[in-house]
């Protein structure tokens, strides 16, 4: 799998922000077909960091209603990457600009 196609974007929530500060864990939305090895390789090459571990899970899309019509948001794969002590990703560290 092409490394540029593995990571779709960052996933930033309050809970994941606390995990980043306390445990050096960063979260990404990744391609559903990507394996843990693909995610680790992509993060290491794109951000120049050392990955210690990768946890993945598939988040089921929620059912949403607008009036009478019912729709469903798509499922997506979430990857939580743990980095080596001292490494960080600047994409997550930036403040308000």
Swiss-Prot record:
GO terms for molecular function: rRNA binding; structural constituent of ribosome. SUPFAM superfamilies: Ribosomal proteins S24e, L23 and L15e. Gene3D superfamilies: 3.30.70.330. It comes from the Bacteria. Keywords: Ribonucleoprotein, Ribosomal protein, RNA-binding, rRNA-binding. GO terms for cellular component: ribonucleoprotein complex; ribosome. It holds the Pfam family Ribosomal_L23. Signal peptide: none annotated. InterPro entries: Nucleotide-bd_a/b_plait_sf, Ribosomal_uL23-like, Ribosomal_uL23/eL15/eS24_sf, Ribosomal_uL23_CS. One of its GO terms (biological process) is translation. PROSITE patterns: RIBOSOMAL_L23. Part of the 50S ribosomal subunit. Contacts protein L29, and trigger factor when it is bound to the ribosome. NCBIfam families: PRK05738.1-3, PRK05738.2-4, PRK05738.3-2. PANTHER family: 60S RIBOSOMAL PROTEIN L23A. Belongs to the universal ribosomal protein uL23 family. One of the early assembly proteins it binds 23S rRNA. One of the proteins that surrounds the polypeptide exit tunnel on the outside of the ribosome. Forms the main docking site for trigger factor binding to the ribosome. This is Large ribosomal subunit protein uL23. It comes from Myxococcus xanthus (strain DK1622).
